[in-house]
Each structure stands twice: as C-alpha cells, then as structure tokens.
C-alpha cells in the first residue's frame, strides 16, 4: 500500500507525515529539519542513496505549484521500495543507483504558501488574514488560487543572487513592487528564512546537479545568461527526449534570480527548472499520474548523470 497520497491536496502537515512514514518504512531514507518557515512550519529534507554523486531536488518554491511535492515524495517511495525488494525503478537497477548517487530533496520549500492555497489555513487566523490583506492590492490575481509567494508576500524563486537587480527592475516595471501574491523579489536577495536555508543547504551538499520543480508548461529550462556548463545541454536534451518535454531557454522576464540561475552562476554545474503539467495553477490532481510518468525518467537521468 502506497505511503504517498496522490489523490488529496498535499498540505504541509501531510508532507511532514509522509516524510516521517517513509523514514520509518525505509530506514535507509533520512530526514532532517532544514529550518522553519516565516510562520513556523517545518521545512524538511528527505534523502535516499549512499553514493558519491550528489544531486538535490526541490519542489513547491511556489505555493500554487504544490502538486510538485508529491512528485518528489512518490519518486523517493518508489526508489526506496525497489531498493528494499532488490528490484528496479524506471528500468534502472535500484541497488546499483543507490550505491552510485545520494539524492537530497527538499519536497516543500514554501509550506506557508502551500497551506494557504490547499485550504489548510483557516480564515480569521493571522497567517490567512496576512495574505488576504496583501492580496487586496492585487485584485486581478485570484485569491488564494493565484498565490505563489510565501505569506510575507515574497516570491521565493526571485530571491537568489543571480541577476537579482535585473529581476527587481523587470518585476517592478510589471507592477510587482511590494509584497503580494507573486513576483515581489523582496528587499534583498536571500532575506527570507526559506531561501537562506535552501542556499546554505545547497552549499553544504555541494551537489553535482539540481532540479527545481515548478508548474506548468511541460518545459525544461537549462541555462542562465551566457554561462557555459559542460554537458548541461546534452543532459537536458536527454531528459527532454525521455519525458516528451521541450528543452528551452528561459523567457527574459523570468530569466533572473531563480534558484537554478543561482546554482548555475555560482557552482558552474547543471541546474534545471522543470515546469510540469499544463493548464492554470494550481493544477488538478487528475494530472498527477501523467506528470509523474513523464518526470520519472527526468529524476532518474539527473540522478545517474550519464548522457
């Protein structure tokens, strides 16, 4: 029986319960508390594998993209089950893969925002009303479904020191010059608890590659400015071929201050933003099975790293 629930909204409490259940069912899966969010929700890691290659996968930087969290959790569960049973995952021998790579994950970077969009926050309570007040100055953005930011109104994927000033200029020109549901870069790079902790964790792990999971568009973004990363395009092309997703350059208005941008700039290694599914966020859970099927080969290819 599956531990990861893919037919109900993935709240922060359900995510934490799932991580605990996975580490109990599969003792070779490990977890640690990375930090607490602005409103005190735990942000946890989930780690599987024992190999020398290190990769880091993140999901739910954006609140209304929470469907990416069960993608990561389901992958860890399927991988763990295959290790325990001496089987394979996606055609790869699980034991061999686990001995060659360690997969670090942060399945829910933005638990406060996710709980707003999934309905886990109660109207009348401070976190909900904080967001509701910020949203009133953006009447054209549906509330709470259009919410991407944390509950301080900062877009966590515009917080990284890789073209942050360019991102600020672009987003301010679009009217996102104050805290709100989306696209506000904050007062300074990495000034939010969530982004500071993830940047520190990334530096601590020093991974060979990162995947940042978002929705939507069935697209893989792979580059930052003119930074040349050996093998990045080739690996991206392989992931695109196996998933059916398109490998594309990031549109200019979204090309700065993202997590993968920062990783590419400072580490000089492959970093990818994966935009899963199609439609209007938050994507319905009816898309989950297709999203997971498309992304399993991406997750495995990134872990193996061979072109």
Predicted feature descriptions by range:
Residues 1-43:
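Short glycine- and acidic-rich boundary segments immediately preceding or forming the N-terminal edge
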Residues 163-307:
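Metallocarboxypeptidase
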Residues 52, 67, 74-76, 80-221, ...:
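Active-site/substrate-binding loop(s) of hydrolase catalytic cores
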Residues 63-69:
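Di-metal (Zn2+ and/or Mg2+/Mn2+) metal-binding site signature of metallo-dependent hydrolases
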Residues 31-35, 85-94, 247-252:
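Surface-exposed patches in mature extracellular/periplasmic domains of secreted proteins
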Residues 54-56, 272:
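Conserved beta-strand elements of the Class I
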Residues 44-52, 60:
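Short beta-strand-to-loop junctions in surface cap/lid or active-site-entrance loops
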Residues 1-6, 57, 180-181:
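Acidic/histidine-rich, surface-exposed loop or edge segments in extracytoplasmic proteins
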């Amino acid at each position: 029986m599956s531990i990861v629930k893919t037919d109900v909204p993935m709240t922060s409490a359900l995510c934490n319960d799932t991580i605990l259940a996975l580490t109990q069912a599969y003792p070779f899966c490990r977890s640690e508390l990375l930090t607490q969010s602005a409103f005190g929700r735990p942000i946890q890691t989930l780690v599987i594998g024992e190999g020398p290659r290190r990769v880091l996968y993140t999901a739910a930087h954006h609140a209304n993209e929470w469907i990416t969290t069960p993608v990561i959790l389901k992958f860890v569960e399927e991988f763990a089950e295959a290790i325990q049973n001496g089987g394979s995952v996606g055609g790869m021998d699980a034991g061999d893969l686990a001995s060659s790579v360690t997969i670090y994950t942060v399945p829910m970077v933005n638990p406060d925002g996710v709980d707003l969009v999934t309905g886990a926050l109660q109207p009348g309570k401070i976190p909900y009303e904080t967001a509701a007040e910020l949203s009133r100055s953006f009447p054209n953005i549906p509330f709470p479904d259009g919410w991407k930011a944390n509950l301080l109104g900062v877009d966590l994927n515009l917080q990284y020191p890789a073209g942050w000033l360019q991102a600020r200029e672009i987003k301010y020109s679009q009217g996102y010059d104050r805290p709100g549901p989306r696209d506000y870069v904050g007062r300074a790079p990495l000034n939010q608890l969530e982004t500071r902790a993830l940047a520190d964790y990334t530096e601590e792990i020093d991974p060979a590659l990162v995947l940042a999971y978002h929705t939507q568009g069935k697209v893989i973004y792979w580059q930052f400015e003119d930074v040349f990363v050996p093998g990045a395009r080739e690996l991206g092309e392989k992931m695109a071929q196996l998933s059916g997703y398109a490998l594309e350059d990031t549109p200019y208005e979204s090309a700065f201050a993202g997590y993968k941008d920062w990783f590419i700039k400072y580490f000089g290694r492959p970093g990818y933003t994966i935009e899963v599914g199609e439609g209007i966020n938050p994507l319905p859970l009816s898309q989950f099975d297709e999203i997971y099927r498309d992304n399993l080969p991406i997750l495995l290819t990134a872990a193996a790293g061979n072109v």
